[in-house]
């Protein structure tokens, strides 16, 4: 039986908010085909802005992986993530044209602004490497699990949205998330009690921010 790590224990402990983030009503509406396409357009515009703020965060993760990890493979995993973000931004631009979303006119809503400030806080040199890697995994994993759900057997995902679902729900991205999780777990194994507490708090905060982001896409703030 595979050994369960610290992150799995935390997910069990905070199962309610984890489920709220990975099986949100917005995601479920995509899977069952009832999604309001205006909500999808809102999500598209807001997520494009988020990704542009996510890039410098991942760049900071790369620097920390080079300086603080002690494992050269960490840098390679994060570098792969940065490379994929360039393609992701181009994908958003194509989708924006397809859905008539002019990103230059999109204003970040409150949930997006709060998430952006959270990312900036994580970029502080005061934040410990295990905490950063836990947050990095959680941010990526929520999208992977959410959009993979939209591709599972029995889905009624609208054909025009399958591209978005495949972008984050594919097996390659799942493997990437697993690699990031392994890094986080390795770091957490030897972390102090204080750092473990900070990492758990950050994990929960990511999940809360993800729920708020989905809510925003459905018409909230």
Curated annotation (Swiss-Prot):
Annotated positions binding substrate: 47, 88, 140
GO biological process: thiamine biosynthetic process; thiamine diphosphate biosynthetic process
Pfam families, A to Z: TENA_THI-4
Reactions listed under catalytic activity: 4-amino-5-aminomethyl-2-methylpyrimidine + H2O = 4-amino-5-hydroxymethyl-2-methylpyrimidine + NH4(+); N-formyl-4-amino-5-aminomethyl-2-methylpyrimidine + H2O = 4-amino-5-aminomethyl-2-methylpyrimidine + formate
Traits of the deletion mutant: No visible phenotype.
MF annotations from Gene Ontology: thiaminase activity
Record keywords, A-Z: Disulfide bond, Hydrolase, Thiamine biosynthesis
Function: Involved in thiamine salvage by hydrolyzing the thiamine breakdown product 4-amino-5-aminomethyl-2-methylpyrimidine (amino-HMP) to 4-amino-5-hydroxymethyl-2-methylpyrimidine (HMP). Has a high formylamino-HMP amidohydrolase activity. No activity with other thiamine degradation products such as thiamine mono- or diphosphate, oxothiamine, oxythiamine, thiamine disulfide, desthiothiamine or thiochrome as substrates. Does not display thiaminase II activity, as it is unable to hydrolyze thiamine.
Pathway given in the UniProt record: Cofactor biosynthesis; thiamine diphosphate biosynthesis
Active site, UniProt feature: 210
Family: Belongs to the thiaminase-2 family.
Disulfide bonds: 150-165
EC number: 3.5.1.-, 3.5.99.2
InterPro entries registered for this protein in UniProt: Haem_Oase-like_multi-hlx, TenA_E, Thiaminase-2/PQQC, Thiamine_Salvage_TenA
UniProt keyword Disulfide bond present: yes
Expression by tissue: Expressed in roots and shoots.
Stated name of the protein: Bifunctional TENA-E protein
Enzyme class: hydrolase
Coiled coil: none
Disulfide bond recorded as keyword: yes
